[in-house]
Amino acid sequence: MISSNDFRPGVSIVLDGSVWRVIDFLHVKPGKGSAFVRTTLKNVQSGKVLEKTFRAGETVPQATLEKITMQHTYKEGDEFVFMDMESYEEGRLSASQIGDRVKYLKEGMEVNVIRWGEQVLEVELANSVVLEVIQTDPGVKGDTATGGTKPAIVETGATVMVPLFISQGERIKIDTRDDKYLGRE
């Protein structure tokens, strides 16, 4: 159990049978009446955002989350097969469980899997990945009227906007959080 006075961004709680992460909180002490904590919560499974108010000192169950380092070994049909780096057990996850970062997942990559009990809540990739450009238009000299970027398709199939000087076959570093080009590798 955790007190509402101990809420901080990133704390996970159990509310109505599902896991919610505290995004923001505000401790309010009105001149008249008792203090309360106004929170913004995000459902870890569905992504739904909720505004909820708790009485100051109210206790709620804290979610005990387990973070496991796993390695993506291969893809079989619509499922991705991962191996636990400590116990060497295999686990399977669907693309919907991995989320939109599946476009940067390649074989041999290590990820952190966040579990609550036996249920997988989310898959965390590294903040940046290095991938090879497999298709992009050649940059034409003097063609900078559009801001100097062009689309490029990387080895995992994701499309990223890159500078005009990037050519096919180059390895580039990409930020997985906002799909931005970070540099050559």
Swiss-Prot record:
Alphabetized Pfam families for the sequence: EFP (PF01132), EFP_N (PF08207), Elong-fact-P_C (PF09285)
Source taxon at top rank: Bacteria
GO cellular component: cytoplasm
UniProt keywords, alphabetically: Cytoplasm, Elongation factor, Protein biosynthesis
Main subcellular localisation: cytoplasm
Pathway given in the UniProt record: Protein biosynthesis; polypeptide chain elongation
GO molecular function, one term: translation elongation factor activity
Subcellular location: Cytoplasm
InterPro entries reported for this sequence: Elong-fact-P_C (IPR015365), NA-bd_OB-fold (IPR012340), Rib_uL2_dom2 (IPR014722), Transl_elong_fac_P/YeiP (IPR020599), Transl_elong_KOW-like (IPR013185), Transl_elong_P/YeiP_cen (IPR001059), Transl_elong_P/YeiP_CS (IPR013852), Transl_elongation_fac_P (IPR011768)
CDD domains: S1_EF-P_repeat_1 (cd04470), S1_EF-P_repeat_2 (cd05794)
Record-level GO BP terms: peptide biosynthetic process
UniProt family annotation: Belongs to the elongation factor P family.
Known function: Involved in peptide bond synthesis. Stimulates efficient translation and peptide-bond synthesis on native or reconstituted 70S ribosomes in vitro. Probably functions indirectly by altering the affinity of the ribosome for aminoacyl-tRNA, thus increasing their reactivity as acceptors for peptidyl transferase.
Name of the molecule in the record: Elongation factor P
Organism name: Trichormus variabilis (strain ATCC 29413 / PCC 7937) (Anabaena variabilis)
